């Protein structure tokens, strides 16, 4: 597998592996295939699609995805066990992720082994995979809580064994962006190996930590659609891509206009509805109600928006409610094909706010029209 040389960052989507490891989430086989196709269509570089050593439907679906002829690299996840890697190779994938714990708490309490055993197991699995000619990512599980000297030694051993990159796993979402930058830069300075960020959201910093890793020299970022994943989830595909584009000025050539569509599909397939305020793709992200905000957004959308909503498959919404001002009312009636004067807007506004308070929500279009009929139309009739 050869990645294009001209891209500043490569996106590795693990919705179908780590995303499906969200407690209670199971994708149907056809859903996994459709998600893989959708992600490939928008230009994702690599898809981590499952764990073949589970056997059964899992292995069968990984093999089906590998045979689709997608443009993206297809990766399967493995423990640092030769048998696992063999199972993946039988599926026809072009890349394997070989994962093993590196922190002392994992080595001593979960694996009940030694650091040397970790190095030996990883090396054996990597060498086997490279002999078979596939791309290899070595996953340092719980890297964020690993002794720095050992983490560098682990990275060096992975490189010597032939690994193509190191996946830096903040497995329990323990880091902040400052520490992330420090650790990733230390690895990059010590070992000539590509690094992938794999960050979890336990403290709400998954996306920020992923960006910090990129700042420190990581060229790969692992993500999931909607931030699905173990516990609090992973860095979200849509957040990372848009942040890289607008914060770091890195356009990855991904068709972001389908983000909302893909997010909705994954939300439905996973049984995890999208929160209205979900960053980038939530329905409220481009919804404006406050009078000052609406006035600014109507004059120039970029006063209160960083990018055009159509860029991620959304539309701007002007919501009429308690905090609305006259500019919002005038604009809303323009959408209805009616001209509302400034005087009429000032007359209607108190009634709008009162109804919104009574209903404890914004007004629907019909309700706004009823108010208009009662306050403006009938008011004029009475005046005559």
From Swiss-Prot:
Q: Provide the primary localization.
A: cytoplasm
Enumerate the subcellular locations listed in this protein's record, separating them with semicolons: Cytoplasm
| Pathway(s) annotated for this protein in UniProt | Amino-acid biosynthesis; L-leucine biosynthesis; L-leucine from 3-methyl-2-oxobutanoate: step 1/4
SUPFAM superfamilies, sorted: Aldolase
One Pfam annotation reads HMGL-like
Write out the transmembrane intervals.
Answer: none
Select a single GO molecular function from the record's annotations and give it: metal ion binding
Q: Which PANTHER family match?
A: HOMOCITRATE SYNTHASE (PTHR42880), ISOPROPYLMALATE_HOMOCITRATE_CITRAMALATE SYNTHASE FAMILY PROTEIN (PTHR42880:SF1)
Family as reported in the entry's similarity comment = Belongs to the alpha-IPM synthase/homocitrate synthase family. LeuA type 1 subfamily.
- This protein is called what? 2-isopropylmalate synthase 2
Natural source organism:
Caldanaerobacter subterraneus subsp. tengcongensis (strain DSM 15242 / JCM 11007 / NBRC 100824 / MB4) (Thermoanaerobacter tengcongensis)
The gene name on file is leuA2
